[in-house]
Amino acid sequence: LDAGITIAAPAKMIGALSALSGVVRVDPTSCPSAIESLLQDAGCSLSYGPDPCVLPKACKNSVEIAGTITAHLRDAGAMCEFLAWLDAQPADTLSEIDVVRALEGFRQATGALKDISFDTICGAGPNGAIIHYRVTEDSNRAVKPGDLLLIDSGGQYLDGTTDITRTVAMGDVGNAEKSAFTRVLQGMIAMSRIRWPAGLRGRDLDLAARQPLWMAGQDYPHGTGHGVGSFLSVHEGPQRLSRASGQVLKPGM
């Protein structure tokens, strides 16, 4: 670490902040109001602006990029084994919790998993339409033939963090489901292939993913994508693909 960086126990933070003086940078998008008040009470002059640590962290270096690739290849192997397992299960024998436990087991079997990236989202049928749904013993639904099964999951590895969403048709589904799936896939392909000039923001590219749905009078109320940490938070800013994102997209993000 740089000579100007000091590491201290979290328990010492309040005392250290109370002892500060002079000008202190505060990021209004992430600083808790209690910390802001503490600094003001200490007599600090607050300078509001982006956290200077966030952007360098978001732009991965060559080691982090190589680690991310390795982590994704490892995680993809576990995901492929899981999907093969799911395809081989007899119809009408699984619940959402069964699916979650199986997927986490395949990631554990890599021998490199440190933790899951977040509580696995596994929604069968109507539960798949609930944004950030988390299955519980009370909400646990049987996976039925004809369901769309949405699975949003990821793994934390020393060399990288993953976050992958897949929607699986459990047997035959209707034309409306096929159309929605296809249009989302078209948006994903468009985003994967797009090349853009330097200086564009997440909001400038977000529409490429939505355009196939817009053609059918459809849309989704949440963002399209987000940054991912390197063995850190699975949601890492400041970059996002959403209507509201004003962050310029930079190499390494």
Regions found by a protein language model. Give the residues of each.
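Active-site neighborhoods and metal-handling regions in enzymes and metal-associated proteins
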Residues: 1-253
